[in-house]
Amino acid sequence: MKLSPLPVLLVEDEPAVMAYVRAALERSGYPVVCCESGVEALRLLEGGSFLGVVSDMRTPGGVDGGQVHAWIARHRPDLAGRVVFITGDIANEETVATLRETGAPCVEKPFRVQQFIEVIAKTLGKV
């Protein structure tokens, strides 16, 4: 297995979920940079290069996954088609609206690693 030359930015505030997703990505050849909030994600996106972004829909600090995607669309359009959302709240009206607006794929928690990695490979490319 070869490694991607660029890391995936993982935005997830739940430590157990972050560890699970990070391990799944790394085992599949994707290096990972983790952060716990949308605010931190924006800071990292301003100065870093990433293969793509995996973001929880709900993150602390006043900037959620949808707002991270909106920022990416404005400031890093090269990444706009390489965002994957993860959420345990797929039926929430705000989540549904964000998914409709962005067109980004979403994997509902809890999920199987194989299901998640299939979405990642389709969205970010296989490594």
Question: Would you name each region that the model predicts?
Answer:
Residues E12:
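Conserved acidic carboxylate
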Residues L3-L6:
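Phosphate-coordination loops involved in phosphoryl transfer and adenosine-cofactor binding
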Residues A121-V127:
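The C-terminal output helix
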Residues R43, D64-L79:
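Short amphipathic alpha-helix used as the core "switch/output" element in two-component signaling
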Residues V63-Q67, A80, V84-E108, Q114, ...:
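Alpha4 helix (beta4-alpha4-beta5 surface) of REC/receiver domains from two-component response regulators
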Residues P15, E36-E40, Q114:
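Acidic phosphotransfer microenvironment of two-component signaling modules
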Residues A19-R27:
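Charged docking surfaces used in two-component/phosphorelay signaling
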Residues L9, R22, C34-G52, P60, ...:
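Acidic, metal-coordinating helix/loop segments flanking the phosphotransfer/catalytic sites
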